[in-house]
Amino acid sequence: MATIIINKENFYHNLNQIALKTGSVEKIAIVLKDNAYGHGLQLMASLSAEFGIRHAVVRSMEEAKNIKELFRTVLVLGDHAVKDDICSFALNCLNDIENAELGARVELKVDTGMHRNGIAPEELERALQMIQKKDLELVGVMTHFRSADEMGSELFWQQKQFASVKERVKEAGFMNVRFHSHNSAATLRSKTFDEDLVRVGIGAYGYNELPDVFDDIPLKPVLSLSAKKIATRRLKKGERVGYGGDFTAPEEMTVSTYDLGYGDGWCRGDSAHPYITAEGLPILGRVSMDFIILESAKEELVIMNDAQKAARQFGTISYEMTTALSINIERKIVDR
């Protein structure tokens, strides 16, 4: 099967760049949801803890169970709130408060403009009263920015809305809560930082999705994807390759199959516009479930070493390229 290589040096470089923005490693919450954006949940959690990260964010309690002993706090974004000494749970609506287990540690999400998850600002006082009545421990209040990675003033508009939320929470008597709103994009573009945490995902893994005008933070991709040779054959001019015979050899050539396909989470794409690998080789014909064909006889080839560049070829985003990669692919750490 294919292999994913995790570059420890690049990961720590990115975390250092983010710490320079926040002023402290203590303020970084590493986002590890969805198998750490495809990089490997337990592997990236261990590297993060080794670096000194004390806070993590995951999608489910199942993910949290695998890594929570490594961190001081773990925020669970999408699961039922239960009582736990380390985990806190996002409250995305008033019903979440009603359904939370007595005494659970919770973090209230407020919708400041994304209109995806979170209570409406006008529901804030009611939500706080419900939290008190249910005897829940409110440890945080948060929001999420819908367009921090785009030009325009929407980020600042949402920040203004959240500033009002913070004041109202304090006025209601909740003084010992942590406030957080910054994702990777907001963190990288902000000149000042005055919150308790940043929730850093894609930035930690080496990708700055901001417009070029903000591209002054040197991040380095952490993940590379390689495939091993299965078989080699010599094609004659005119012979066709793979399902549908979409590729026709223009001359006599040597081709090999490599152990990567859409069954591993690799994008099938369009054989009329073939993907060009990190080594400059186009995939020949259609991507199969378990194989791709390339003009090479090398034992191993690097297919992708920059998910952002790869994503542009497929008309998608770096997030999708990495999170789609199968959990069954072996992941290895290299120091550099």
UniProtKB/Swiss-Prot annotation:
Origin species: Sulfurovum sp. (strain NBC37-1)
Protein's UniProt keywords contain Isomerase: yes
Active site, UniProt feature: K33, Y243
Known role: Catalyzes the interconversion of L-alanine and D-alanine. May also act on other amino acids.
NCBIfam families noted in UniProt: alr (TIGR00492), PRK00053.2-2 (NF000791)
EC number(s) reported in the record: 5.1.1.1
Keywords, ordered alphabetically: Isomerase, Pyridoxal phosphate
Protein name: Alanine racemase
Catalytic activity: L-alanine = D-alanine
Positions where N6-(pyridoxal phosphate)lysine occurs in the chain: K33
Top-level taxon in the UniProt lineage: Bacteria
SUPFAM superfamilies per record: Alanine racemase C-terminal domain-like (SSF50621), PLP-binding barrel (SSF51419)
An example molecular function term from Gene Ontology annotations: pyridoxal phosphate binding
Pathway(s) of this molecule: Amino-acid biosynthesis; D-alanine biosynthesis; D-alanine from L-alanine: step 1/1
GO cellular component: cytosol
Residues holding substrate: R116, M289
A GO biological-process term: D-alanine biosynthetic process
Family stated for the protein in its record: Belongs to the alanine racemase family.
UniProt cross-references to Pfam families, sorted A to Z: Ala_racemase_C, Ala_racemase_N
